[in-house]
A protein has these predicted regions:
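Divalent metal-binding acidic/histidine catalytic loops
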Residues: 1-279
Length: 279
């Protein structure tokens, strides 16, 4: 999209019925492109997709901008590196361990497929890593936040996600926890599927988040949260820690790879972060 453009502030004329149909068709084409690997347009597409019911001329122009970008940069390759990431275990040693969390979440246990449905392990075990982020109150009209996360198997990007949150959150802390819960749900499903395919998994999924409060509340049993719908996300993440599904650690915002899926960044920052897993 054009630099500085905010789709929610666009007040250009609304499209007619034919224009709406055309807009929806173009969105569908771009979604297909994202599904097969054009992750560099995911954030912009996510923002514009929310206006499919009543798009404006300005929204259509931005769709054309995206197609122009794809024409000028027709190739983007994702790295699929089978080697394990070089992650220092000491990053995940702060806070309470899994056994301590078990004191509160006694029934926490990772769901595993039935033994008769699991084939013999194939190949060597893999590790899974996730980066999660949220752009708090990113929408200038509704003040809804935006969730973004990515999941890796070893060093291979396997899942990418960018979507506006369903609720309006009063704090960055709440929006980040809701993003973390969404990420945990995808992690749980991925781990189940890998086992169904006969792929052994090395320990818990390592999750990186750039919000220190979220990391502290995910790794220290003594923390509490009372806001109802936020506390659901809060306990879901902590339950996953107790079940051994995830381990959570802090990462500097500058190196949070999920940052590109929550908001529009400068060209330099985009290129640096995308350069970690694309070429």
């Amino acid at each position: 999209m054009a630099q500085g453009y905010q789709p929610e502030l666009d007040m250009s004329p609304e499209l007619d019925e034919n224009g709406i149909t055309s807009f929806q068709e173009l969105i569908g084409i771009l979604r297909w492109a994202v599904e097969i690997g054009r992750v560099d347009i995911l954030t912009e597409l996510s923002m514009l997709s929310t206006y499919q019911a009543c798009p404006r001329q300005g929204h259509m122009e931005q769709i054309h901008h995206i197609f122009s970008y794809l024409k000028n940069k027709p190739k983007l390759t994702l790295y699929f590196d089978p080697s394990e990431p070089n992650i220092d275990p000491i990053w995940f040693q702060s806070g309470d361990n899994q056994d301590t969390f078990k004191e509160q979440y006694r029934e926490a246990k990772e769901e595993l497929p039935p033994d008769h449905m699991v084939p013999e392990p194939l190949g060597r075990p893999v590790s899974t890593t996730a980066y999660v982020d949220a752009s708090h109150a990113a929408n200038k009209v509704t003040r809804r936040s935006h969730t973004g996360f990515i999941l890796f198997i070893n060093k291979s990007l396997i899942i990418w996600y960018s979507k506006r949150q369903n609720t309006v959150e009063a704090s960055t802390f709440s929006s980040e926890f809701i993003a973390a819960k969404c990420c945990v749900e995808h992690i749980t499903a991925l781990r189940f599927k890998l086992r169904m395919f006969g792929v052994p998994i090395i320990e818990s999924t390592k999750v990186f988040c750039d919000n220190q409060s979220v990391v502290n509340n995910s790794t220290k049993l003594s923390s509490t949260l009372n806001k109802k719908h936020s506390s659901i996300a809060y306990h879901a993440v902590r339950w996953a820690v107790a079940a051994g599904i995830i381990k959570v650690a802090w990462i500097d915002t500058a190196w949070n790879l999920a940052d590109v899926f929550t908001k529009r960044l400068t060209v330099e920052t985009r290129n640096r972060l995308f350069g970690e897993w694309t070429y």
